[in-house]
């Protein structure tokens, strides 16, 4: 079963993201002075005293603003309340109780979830009156902390652990991490929501609505996935807001920690230079990759349109011919069922190991069929090969002249391995080292 969920709830700018980062041990949520910078739910695993749980940083709940996203953020936070096993309600000890605090408290009192009231930004822990005001919220004893300095957060986590439900041993599966990347407004969040069957990620007509890399857990049958919905990646020259620049960096980091990368293209447009750069980043990091052409419902088409588009993708992204291409509509759900199945397939391919004996039988046959070209009149010999790692599958070939194996012959050997063992959706790495015949 999934880990228990602990949600941090509060109005904008009370320090939710700072606390989230403090507990999870790194700068995960974007922190700025702008109220409401966190607009989606961010998920990250945490541990305290041997107990593991998933921490959720929600967008700030504000009730008296004209921002069109406020209603959506509020809905997101309310959804987090439904999912959470424990709720941390964060208030600001400096500003005291506000109308938003009172409305959130009323919402929490109606909830059947255990709530820990936490007063953040406390400067003088020796002053017993610093939290007295918050008793009138009707949520028990406030816990004073300073998230920015890490003061008293240990006591808070002790309270959290006391309230966590027990997790049966051995029931937490290994979830496949899937980074969903692409230019702004190509439909990344819409695809996540379609896969989930609920609006978990804020979707808006405003480009760049998703500003963080948002982790979302889903389960299909016995398989678990973590979908990492990233901020749209623009060219560096177009990034002017500091928050957006940091979001793009986090999108790149999301690719680094992913098992599978979905590169989302806009089917109403061709493959752009930025699309190539985004896809290339996953390729360089050795990630299993799927090219997902979204908005296919909006494309005027005949019986050859899909083939023509696939050929164009293959031409523009020739460096990753191994990646399957899917044509979907996140809006209508067209062919979205293929996405998780393909994720499973490429994830398995990236983790595939080939027995040394089986591998060398294929290598011997390939070398007999097409021997490596000689270099300056000297014969190049391939003695044997072995697989040294997965994700991506990596093979070391031992030869008398490592520098003499031409890149075209390396490509030939790669094609032979793919023909024999599949590896659809994943890059494979070939390394050539000097060795002797066994």
Curated annotation (Swiss-Prot):
PROSITE patterns per UniProt: G_ENGA
Annotated positions binding GTP 1: 10-17, 57-61, 120-123
SUPFAM superfamilies: P-loop containing nucleoside triphosphate hydrolases
InterPro entries: AAA+_ATPase, G_ENGA, GTP-bd, GTPase_Der, KH_dom-like, KH_dom-like_a/b, P-loop_NTPase, Small_GTP-bd
Domain of life: Bacteria
Residues the entry annotates as binding GTP 2: 182-189, 229-233, 294-297
Domain KH-like: residue ranges: 352-436
GO biological process, alphabetically ordered: ribosome biogenesis
Subunit structure and binding partners: Associates with the 50S ribosomal subunit.
Known role: GTPase that plays an essential role in the late steps of ribosome biogenesis.
Protein name from the UniProt record: GTPase Der
Chain's gene name: der
């Amino acid at each position: 079963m999934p880990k228990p969920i602990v949600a941090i709830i509060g109005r904008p700018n009370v320090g939710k993201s700072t606390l989230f980062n403090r507990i999870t041990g790194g700068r995960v949520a974007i922190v700025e002075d702008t109220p409401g910078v966190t607009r989606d739910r961010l998920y990250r695993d945490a541990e305290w005293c041997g107990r593991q749980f998933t921490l959720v940083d929600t967008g700030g709940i504000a009730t008296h603003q004209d921002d069109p996203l406020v209603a959506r953020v509020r809905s997101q936070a309310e959804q987090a309340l439904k999912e959470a096993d424990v709720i941390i309600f964060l208030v600001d000890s400096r500003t005291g109780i506000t109308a938003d605090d009172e409305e959130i408290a009323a919402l929490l009192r109606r909830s059947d979830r255990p709530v820990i009231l936490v007063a953040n930004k406390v400067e003088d822990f020796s002053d017993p009156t610093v939290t007295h005001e918050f008793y009138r919220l009707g949520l028990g004893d406030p816990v004073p902390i300073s998230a920015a300095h890490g003061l008293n957060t240990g006591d808070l986590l002790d309270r959290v652990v006391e309230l966590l439900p027990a997790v049966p041993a051995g029931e937490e599966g290994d979830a496949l991490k899937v980074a969903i990347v692409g230019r702004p407004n190509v439909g990344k969040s819409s695809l996540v929501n379609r896969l989930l069957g609920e609006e978990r990620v804020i979707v808006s007509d405003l480009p760049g609505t998703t500003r963080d890399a948002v982790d979302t857990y889903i389960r299909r049958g016995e398989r678990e996935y973590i979908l990492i919905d990233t901020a749209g990646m623009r060219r560096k020259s177009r990034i002017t807001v500091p928050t957006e620049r940091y979001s793009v960096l986090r999108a790149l980091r999301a690719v680094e920690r992913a098992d599978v990368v979905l590169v989302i293209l806009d089917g109403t447009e061709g493959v752009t230079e930025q699309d190539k750069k985004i896809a290339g980043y996953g390729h360089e990091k050795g990630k299993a990759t799927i090219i997902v052409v979204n908005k296919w419902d909006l494309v005027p088409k005949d019986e050859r349109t899909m083939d023509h588009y696939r050929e164009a993708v293959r031409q523009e992204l020739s460096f990753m011919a191994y990646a399957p291409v899917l044509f979907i509509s996140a809006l209508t759900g067209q062919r979205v069922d293929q996405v998780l199945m393909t994720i499973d397939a490429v994830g398995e391919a990236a983790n595939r190991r080939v027995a040394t004996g089986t591998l060398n039988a294929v290598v011997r046959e390939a070398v007999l069929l097409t021997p490596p070209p000689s270099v300056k009149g000297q014969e190049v010999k391939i003695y044997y090969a072995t697989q040294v790692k997965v994700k991506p599958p990596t093979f070391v070939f031992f030869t008398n002249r490592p520098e003499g194996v031409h890149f075209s012959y390396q490509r030939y050997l790669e094609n032979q391995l793919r023909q024999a063992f599949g590896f659809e959706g994943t890059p494979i790495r070939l390394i050539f080292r000097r060795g002797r015949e066994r």
